Amino acid sequence: MNIKPSTLLFVPGNQEKMLEKAKEKNVYDKLIKQDIITYLSTEVFNFDYFISADVFIYIGDLSDVFRLIKSRNKTGGKLAFSTENYEGDSFFLEKSGRYSHSKKYIEGLCNEFGYNLRLFEKQPLRKDKNQYINGGIYLLEF
């Protein structure tokens, strides 16, 4: 039996350049050109880890993502992800067109869908116009 990690990359439908770059790198087992919610709702998974870096900034309400990851995975697992940090109570569409999410909002999703928050750290994620964008790094267990 050959057991190895499986890596999937979701590419939004309008991001052809991103898809081409990912193909050139040849590091992903599968490139998926589909909306993440649609994909999560049609597949059954057996993953230990779901890792989502710089993905949730393009999704405002994360309820469906949290619900589908937990309900469509055969066993418990871990969800690691980054968000742009918002100091309010929920999520917010920034001028950049990206969403930011508050820790309080993520904690509410954890309570609603049965995740345990194992790690949260505020970190600078990237520079935009010579200013750091603050983010949250999360590790959840379910």
PLM segments and residue spans:
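Short, glycine-/aromatic-enriched active-site segment of Class I SAM-dependent methyltransferases
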Residues: A80-Y99
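A short glycine-rich, Lys/Arg-flanked "PGG" loop and its adjoining helix->strand segment in the class I
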Residues: S63-K78
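A short His-aromatic
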Residues: I57-Y58
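Local beta-strand N-terminus motif with an aromatic residue
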Residues: Y28, N46-D48
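A conserved beta-strand element that flanks and buttresses the S-adenosyl-L-methionine
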Residues: I51-S52
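Class I SAM-dependent methyltransferase SAM/SAH-binding core
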Residues: M1-Y39
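Core SAM-dependent methyltransferase catalytic element
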Residues: F113, P124-F142
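Short alpha-helix
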Residues: R98-G114, R118-F120
